[in-house]
A protein has these predicted regions:
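Amphipathic alpha-helical scaffolding segments
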Residues: 29, 296-300, 373-379, 396-402, ...
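Hydrophobic residues within the alpha-helices of tandem HEAT/HEAT-like
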Residues: 15, 29-35, 71-78, 94-95, ...
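Short, polar/flexible loop-turn hinges at active-site or ligand-entry regions and domain interfaces
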Residues: 120-123, 554
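Short coil/turn segments at helix-helix junctions and helix-capping linkers
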Residues: 10-24, 52-66, 82, 90-105, ...
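Alpha-helical solenoid scaffolds in large eukaryotic transport, assembly, and signaling factors
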Residues: 2-3, 13-67, 71-84, 114, ...
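Acidic, serine/threonine- and proline-enriched intrinsically disordered linkers and terminal tails
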Residues: 295-348, 355, 405-427
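Core helices of alpha-solenoid repeat scaffolds
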Residues: 3-9, 42-51, 80-91, 123-139, ...
C-alpha cells in the first residue's frame, strides 16, 4: 500500500506541472492505476486524488480535461462515500458556472458518476445518497430557466438518473414532476423534447399518485388546446409515456384516443404526425385496451397514407396501366425524385401512417382476413410513393403483413370464410397480380433502397406462397437482371437480387424459367466471378439452382442445356480450384460443382475426371471435407450413373476414416455417402474397401447416439441386400454391438425400425454362420441364461420384435419357434423373464402371421392372465391383442366373449381390445365396430376407475375408425351427461 501511495503522490505532483504533456501523462497513468482491482487508497490519498481530479476539470488543456472526466468513473468505486459526495457537489456547482466549457465537462462528469453507481435494485446507500444530493440541485437548475444550456444539461442528467436510479428517488418524484411539467410549455423546443424524455423515464418508477397527476394534467391541457405548439408537445409526451409504460396508460385510452382523433382532423401536418405516432405507440404497448379503437386507427392511417396535397399521381397511374416486360424508359424514372418542396411536411404524415399500419399488422394476428380486404390493397397502391423514406416504410408494412401470413397457413381461419375460399392465403393469391404490377417498374428505378425493398418483398411473397409468381416471371426477370448488371448497384443490392432469384428458382417449376435461361446465365456467371466474396457465394447458390432448372432430373424435359454447360462449369471450376478464397465460397463452390456433375456429368467429357480429382483433394482437407462428402453423396445418387471409379479406390478408405472422427455431422454425412455408394456402385467396390468401413462401425452402434446408430444399421442393411458376401465378418464385434443395442431401453422409433429391417435382410442372405437359429439364440440367450443384463421392460419388447422380424423373413421356422414359446409359457419351471419374452414374442409374431393353427394358444395366454407377476399378466394381455390382429375373425369374437363372461379378467381383456383397436386396419375392424361399441358402453359404468379409463380410451380410438357415425353419438352422450364422456 505504501508503494502505491508513493506512486500516486508522484503522479499528483506531475499533475501540477506547467507542461500540459506532463499533466496529460500523469492523469493517464492515474487512470490506469485506478482501474486496477488491487489498488487501495488511504484517506489522505483519497482526498488529494479527488481534489486534483476536480481541479483538472478546469484545466486549460481540453485533452487533460477529458482524461480527468474519464478518471471519475473508476474513482467513484475506489473512494469513500463522503468523497463521492464532494465530487458530486463540486460537479453540480460547476454546472452553474459562467464558463461553457466547464459546464459541459461537469455535465459529462455527473453522467459518468451516475453511470458508475450500483443499480437501484442493489439497495446501495451510496447510490441513494448521491442521487438525492444531485436531485435537489438539478430540480432547481431546471426550474430557474435562466440559462437554457444549463437547463438542457440538467434535464439530460435528470433523464439519465431516472432511467438508472429512478426507484431510489420515490420521495423526490412529486418535486421532479412539479419542476418538469412547466418545461412542457418552454419557448425552446429542445427543452420540451428533453423534458418529454425525462417524463418518459419518470413514469417507469413513479407511484400511482404521481402518474395520475401527470396524465390528468396532460388531458386537461389537451382539452384546453391553448396553442398548436403546446398541443403537439402534449401529444408527444403521451406517446413517450405509452412507449415507456404502456401497461399503466392503457386504462386512460378511452379518454385519450378521442382527443387524439380530434386533433388528427386539424390542418397541421406536424400535429397529425405526432397523433399517428401516438396511435402506433398505443397499438404496440396497449394491445388489449386499444382493441376497440383499432378500426378507427386503421381508417385514419389509410386516409393519411395517401395524404400528399402537393403532388398529383394521376399521370403516373395512366402510365402504369400496361405492364411492359422491358420496363419503362430509364430517363423518366428519376422524375419523381426531382420534385422537392422544403415546406412540404406531408411526407412525415404518410410515413407515420405507414409505420402505424405496420404496428397494427404486426400485433393483431386475428384480423388478417380484414387486413387483406382493406390494408393490403391500400399499401400496394402506395408502392408508387414518391418519397423514398416513406416508400421504404410502406414496403416494410407490407412485409410485416406477409410475415404474419406465413405462420397462420393452417390456423386462424374463420371456418365460414374457408368454405367460401376466403382465407388470408387465397386473398393474397388474388392480389399477386397487383403486387407485381406495382413492383415491376420500380425494380428498374435508380434508387438502390427501393430496389432492395422490391427484392425483399418478392422473396417473402414466394416464401409465403410458393409458385405465386409463375405467371409473372417474364415481367420480373428483366428487373432482376437490371440490378445484377447495373454498375451503380451496391454490393448489398446485388446480394438481395441474387437471394431473391434463388428463392424464386427454388419455389417454381423449372419449365417456367426455360425461356429466360439465356438472359439469366450471363449476369449470374459474372457475379460468380465478383471480387466480393458474399456476392460470389450467393451467385454460386443461384448457379446450383440454375443447373437444376436447365436439366431437371426428376421429370422429363425437352430443354437443351448444352449451350450453357460450358459457362456454368467454367465459372464454378475457377472458384473450386482457388485456394485463397473465403470458406463460405469454398463450400458453395463444392456444392455447386456437385450439382453440376450430378445433373450434367454426362456432358463434361474429360473435365469430369479432373474435377473428381479436385473433390478427392477437398476430401482430404479438414475444412472442406464435410461439404465434399455431401457433394459426393449427391453425385453418387445421380440417375446419370456418373463414373466414380477413378476416385473410389482412394476415396472410400478416406470416408471410412471419417467414421472415427469426433464430428457428428461428418459421421452422419459419411454414412449417407457410403450407403448410396453401396447401392449404386457395388460392382466397383472391392472387399478391402468394404472391410475398411466395417472395421470402423462397432463404436458407432451405441445407445449414446441413436441417430448415428440408426444410420450405421441402415448402411449394414444396404450391405446385406447388395453385397451379402461382405457380412460374413460381422459375426464378431459388430453383431455383439447390435445385440447390445437391442437390449437397450432407448431403442425405439426409427432406430428400432432400422434394426428390424437389418435382421430380416441379414437372415435372408443365407450366410452360413448367421442363420435363423443362430441369430435367435443370440437375441434370446441372455433371458434363458437368466442373465442380469436385461433389467428394463423395453428390452423384452425390442427382442420380441426382432424375433418376429426374423420369423417373418423365415416363415418356415415359425411353427417350431411358436410351439417352443408356448411351451415356455406353460412350463412351470420357466422364470417370469422367460414367460414375459415368450408372450411378447408370440404377440409380435402373431401380429403378422396367423397363429390360429396353434390349438392351445388361447388357453395358454388366458392361463397367463392368472400369473402372480403383473408384468407377465400385462404381456399376456398385449399378446392376446396383438395375435388377434393377425386373424380378426378368429380372435376378436373370442376376446369380446371373454370380456363378457370373465369379469375377473375384464381389465386385462379390455387392454387386449385396446391393442386390437389401435393396431388393426380400419377395413378389417369396421365389420366389428357396432359389436365393440355396444360392449364398451355396457362397461362404461363400471365401478372401477381403471376399467372406466380403458373403456374411454377404447371408445376414443374406435371413434377414429368411423368418425362420421360415432362422433355424433359421443356428442349425444356428452349432452346427456353420461359418465363415460368424462374419461375420453
Amino acid at each position: 500500500m505504501a508503494s502505491a501511495s508513493y506512486h500516486i503522490s508522484n503522479l499528483l505532483e506531475k499533475m501540477t506541472s506547467s507542461d500540459k504533456d506532463f499533466r496529460f501523462m500523469a492523469t493517464n497513468d492515474l487512470m490506469t492505476e485506478l482501474q486496477k482491482d488491487s489498488i487501495k487508497l488511504d484517506d489522505d490519498s483519497e482526498r488529494k486524488v479527488v481534489k486534483m481530479i476536480l481541479k483538472l476539470l478546469e484545466d486549460k488543456n481540453g485533452e487533460v480535461q477529458n482524461l480527468a472526466v474519464k478518471c471519475l468513473g473508476p474513482l467513484v468505486s475506489k473512494v469513500k462515500e463522503y468523497q463521492v459526495e464532494t465530487i458530486v457537489d463540486t460537479l453540480c456547482t460547476n454546472m452553474l458556472s459562467d464558463k461553457e466549457q466547464l459546464r459541459d465537462i461537469s455535465s459529462i462528469g455527473l453522467k459518468t458518476v451516475i453511470g458508475e453507481l450500483p443499480p437501484a435494485s442493489s439497495g446501495s446507500a451510496l447510490a441513494a445518497n448521491v442521487c438525492k444530493k444531485i436531485t435537489g440541485r438539478l430540480t432547481s437548475a431546471i426550474a430557474k430557466q435562466e440559462d437554457v444550456s444549463v437547463q438542457l444539461e440538467a434535464l439530460d442528467i435528470m433523464a439519465d438518473m431516472l432511467s438508472r436510479q429512478g426507484g431510489l428517488l420515490v420521495n423526490f418524484h412529486p418535486s421532479i414532476l412539479s419542476c418538469l411539467l412547466p418545461q412542457l410549455t418552454s419557448p425552446r423546443l429542445a427543452v420540451r423534447k428533453r423534458t418529454i424524455i425525462a417524463l418518459g423515464h419518470l413514469v417507469m418508477s413513479c407511484g400511482n399518485i404521481v402518474f395520475i397527476e401527470l396524465i390528468e394534467h396532460l388531458l386537461a391541457e389537451l382539452s384546453k388546446n391553448d396553442s398548436m405548439s403546446t398541443t403537439r408537445t402534449y401529444i408527444q409526451c403521451i406517446a413517450a409515456i405509452s412507449r415507456q409504460a404502456g401497461h399503466r396508460i392503457g386504462e386512460y385510452l378511452e379518454k385519450i384516443i378521442p382527443l387524439v382523433v380530434k386533433f388528427c382532423n386539424i390542418d397541421d401536418d406536424e400535429l397529425r404526425e405526432y397523433c399517428i405516432q401516438a396511435f402506433e405507440s398505443f397499438v404496440r404497448r396497449c394491445p388489449k385496451e386499444v382493441y376497440p379503437h383499432v378500426s378507427t386507427i386503421i381508417n385514419i392511417c389509410l386516409k393519411y397514407l395517401t395524404y400528399d396535397p402537393n403532388y398529383n399521381y394521376d399521370d403516373e397511374d395512366e402510365d402504369e396501366n400496361a405492364m411492359d416486360a422491358d420496363g419503362a424508359d430509364d430517363d423518366d424514372q428519376g422524375s419523381d425524385d426531382e420534385y422537392s418542396d422544403d415546406d412540404d411536411m406531408s411526407w412525415k404524415v404518410r410515413r407515420a401512417a405507414a409505420k402505424c399500419l405496420d404496428a397494427v399488422v404486426s400485433t393483431r394476428h386475428e384480423m388478417l382476413p380484414e387486413f387483406y380486404k382493406t390494408v393490403s390493397p391500400a399499401l400496394i397502391a402506395r408502392f408508387k410513393e414518391r418519397e423514398e423514406n416513406v416508400k421504404a416504410d410502406v414496403f416494410h408494412a407490407y412485409l410485416s403483413l406477409l410475415k404474419q401470413t406465413r405462420p397462420v397457413q393452417s390456423w386462424l381461419c374463420d371456418p365460414d370464410a374457408m368454405e367460401q375460399g376466403e382465407t388470408p392465403l387465397t386473398m393474397l393469391q388474388s392480389q399477386v397480380p397487383n403486387i407485381v404490377k406495382a413492383l415491376h417498374k420500380q425494380m428498374k428505378e435508380k434508387s438502390v433502397k427501393t430496389r432492395q425493398c422490391c427484392f425483399n418483398m418478392l422473396t417473402e411473397l414466394v416464401n409465403v406462397l410458393p409458385g405465386a409468381l409463375t405467371q409473372h416471371i417474364p415481367v420480373l426477370v428483366p428487373g432482376i437482371i437490371f440490378s445484377l448488371n447495373d454498375k451503380s448497384s451496391s454490393s448489398n443490392l446485388k446480394i438481395d437480387a441474387l437471394s431473391c432469384l434463388y428463392v424464386i428458382l427454388c419455389n417454381h417449376s423449372p419449365q417456367v424459367f426455360h425461356p429466360h435461361v439465356q438472359a439469366l446465365v450471363s449476369p449470374v456467371v459474372i457475379c460468380v466471378g465478383d471480387p466480393f466474396y458474399k456476392i460470389t457465394s450467393e451467385a454460386l447458390l443461384v448457379t446450383q439452382q440454375l443447373v437444376k432448372v436447365i436439366r431437371p432430373l426428376e421429370q422429363p424435359s425437352s430443354f437443351d442445356a448444352a449451350p450453357y454447360i460450358k459457362d456454368l462449369f467454367t465459372c464454378t471450376i475457377k472458384r473450386l480450384k482457388a485456394a485463397d478464397i473465403d470458406q463460405e465460397v469454398k463450400e458453395r463452390a463444392i456444392s455447386c460443382m456437385g450439382q453440376i456433375i450430378c445433373s450434367l456429368g454426362d456432358n463434361l467429357g474429360s473435365d469430369l475426371t479432373n474435377t473428381l480429382q479436385i473433390f478427392l483433394e477437398r476430401l482430404k482437407n479438414e475444412i472442406t471435407r464435410l461439404t465434399t462428402v455431401k457433394a459426393l453423396t449427391l453425385i453418387a445418387g445421380s440417375p446419370l450413373k456418373i463414373d466414380l471409379r477413378p476416385i473410389l479406390g482412394e476415396g472410400v478408405p478416406i470416408l471410412a476414416s471419417f467414421l472415427r472422427k469426433n464430428q457428428r455431422a461428418l459421421k452422419l454425412g459419411t454414412l449417407s455417402a457410403l450407403d448410396i455408394l453401396i447401392k449404386n456402385y457395388s460392382d466397383s467396390l472391392t472387399a478391402e474397401m468394404i472391410d475398411a468401413v466395417l472395421d470402423e462401425l462397432p463404436p458407432l452402434i451405441s445407445e449414446s447416439d441413436m441417430h448415428v446408430s440408426q444410420m450405421a444399421i441402415s448402411f449394414l442393411t444396404t450391405l446385406a441386400k447388395v453385397y451379402p458376401s461382405s457380412l460374413s465378418k460381422i459375426s464378431g464385434s459388430i453383431l455383439d454391438e447390435l445385440i447390445g443395442l437391442v437390449r437397450s431401453p432407448l431403442l425405439q422409433g426409427g432406430a428400432l425400425s432400422a434394426m428390424l429391417e437389418f435382421f430380416q435382410a441379414l437372415v435372408l442372405t443365407g450366410t452360413s454362420c448367421l442363420g435363423y437359429m443362430y441369430l435367435l439364440r443370440m437375441l434370446t440367450g441372455p433371458v434363458y441364461a437368466q442373465s442380469t443384463a436385461l433389467t428394463h421392460k423395453q428390452s423384452y419388447y425390442s427382442i420380441a420384435k426382432c424375433v418376429a422380424a426374423l420369423t417373418r423373413a423365415c416363415p418356415k421356422e415359425g411353427p417350431a419357434v411358436v410351439g417352443q414359446f408356448i411351451q415356455d409359457v406353460k412350463n412351470s419351471r420357466s422364470t417370469d423373464s422367460i414367460r414375459l419374452l415368450a408372450l411378447l414374442s408370440l404377440g409380435e409374431v402373431g401380429h403378422h402371421i396367423d397363429l390360429s393353427g396353434q390349438v392351445e394358444l388361447k388357453s395358454v395366454i388366458l392361463e397367463a392372465f392368472s400369473s402372480p407377476s403383473e408384468e407377465v399378466k400385462s404381456a399376456a394381455s398385449y399378446a392376446l391383442g396383438s395375435i388377434s390382429v393377425g386373424n380378426l375373425p378368429e380372435y376378436l369374437p373370442f376376446v369380446l366373449q371373454e370380456i363378457t363372461s370373465q369379469p375377473k379378467r375384464q381389465y386385462l381383456l379390455l387392454h387386449s381390445l385396446k391393442e386390437i383397436i389401435s393396431s388393426a386396419s380400419v377395413a378389417g375392424l369396421k365389420p366389428y365396430v357396432e359389436n365393440i361399441w355396444c360392449l364398451l358402453l355396457k362397461h362404461s359404468e363400471c365401478a372401477e376407475e381403471g376399467t372406466r379409463n380403458v373403456v374411454a380410451e377404447c371408445l376414443g380410438k374406435l371413434t377414429l375408425i368411423d368418425p362420421e357415425t360415432l362422433l355424433p353419438r359421443l356428442k349425444g352422450y356428452l349432452a346427456a351427461g353420461m359418465l363415460i364422456v368424462y374419461f375420453l
